[in-house]
Amino acid sequence: MAADHTHVRPWRMITRRQSRKIRVGSVEVGGDAPISVQSMTNTLTSDAAATLEQIRQLEEAGADIVRVSCPDVESTAAFKTIAREAKVPLVADIHFHYKRGIEAAQAGAACLRINPGNIGSPDRVRDVIQAARDHGCSMRIGVNAGSLERELLEKYGEPCPDAMVESALNHARILQDHDFHEFKISVKASDPFMTVAAYYQLAEAIDCPLHLGVTEAGATRTGTVKSAIGIGAMLWAGIGDTIRVSLAADPVEEIKVGFDILKSLGLRHRGVNIIACPSCARQGFNVIKTVEALEERLAHISTPMSLSIIGCVVNGPGEALMTDIGFTGGGAGAGMVYMAGKPDHKQSNEGMIDHIVDLVEKKAAEIQAAKAQDEAAQTVAAE
């Protein structure tokens, strides 16, 4: 099998915090499990067909877990159909009405997300815990800076990391007092500084898995930057077991950005990682249009691979050394194609995109075939 060129190491190896492992349906979260990527639907949950269509789009993008809001009885009624047909585990998002949590557990939710700031009294939380236990659901204690309990706001004067962590730990104790330990916690704010400070403090205080995110981060550009800074800082420190990038955009973009963050830190790889120069007067072809076309044409590839698209020979050969496939612009309307870091053949700029797509698809098929062969050999050896 060809050498793995997908991993670009950070300056130091990341040592992940040792958290307790739980399950969200078929997906393990925490411990040594891969860091999962999730998103949330923005359709009306009562419209089961529309919600399922969006879930399928998220599944195709690589989502491990999908959260679905359950604000009313109509939503939890539709949830049963949605959960039955979805391929990924679903988290039911519960606010204000604890009975929606009980209904969602009965309808097939893999996890219940509750907000301590608005779920109600400990007795109501107890009833939700019992429903989760009865139906094999895990739970997420989801604390948001914008919806903290009144007494904590009075105590601290304003939303702050200390208040968020205290809220989370108070509700963790309620779950633990009822001998329920299949839970994870999030402490999110729209300010990356507040978010990171809260998670750092929480990571020292409890061993449960942590769901990372910067809430209400903004539209695609600003939200991506905030999330990359906040989530990236925590992951680099080894904190975090599952992530959700919150964007005011198509939920599929959240999955793409989430995987890009993990790929940038060498924590998880999915699809083609395209390395491209910003282009300048030396470019031998239109780098920007080429990369845009390749991103669209290669979106269906889930096999981890790396591809460098560099406009000239200043950095092109060096970048190609570190990628599975590379293309470097040259003169006379042609460039050099690199395979596994070595010059392989020349290719004219005309037809270059089709040629690169063909090379990537063939390489992905080779990698998958070799992987299947290795797995078959391991199965035989284990028998």
Curated annotation (Swiss-Prot):
The keyword Cell membrane does not apply. Pathway: Isoprenoid biosynthesis; isopentenyl diphosphate biosynthesis via DXP pathway; isopentenyl diphosphate from 1-deoxy-D-xylulose 5-phosphate: step 5/6. Its cofactor is [4Fe-4S] cluster. It catalyses: (2E)-4-hydroxy-3-methylbut-2-enyl diphosphate + oxidized [flavodoxin] + H2O + 2 H(+) = 2-C-methyl-D-erythritol 2,4-cyclic diphosphate + reduced [flavodoxin]. One of its GO terms (molecular function) is 4-hydroxy-3-methylbut-2-enyl-diphosphate synthase activity (flavodoxin). [4Fe-4S] cluster binds at residues 277, 280, 312, 319. Converts 2C-methyl-D-erythritol 2,4-cyclodiphosphate (ME-2,4cPP) into 1-hydroxy-2-methyl-2-(E)-butenyl 4-diphosphate. This is 4-hydroxy-3-methylbut-2-en-1-yl diphosphate synthase (flavodoxin). The lineage of its organism: Bacteria, Pseudomonadati, Pseudomonadota, Alphaproteobacteria, Caulobacterales.
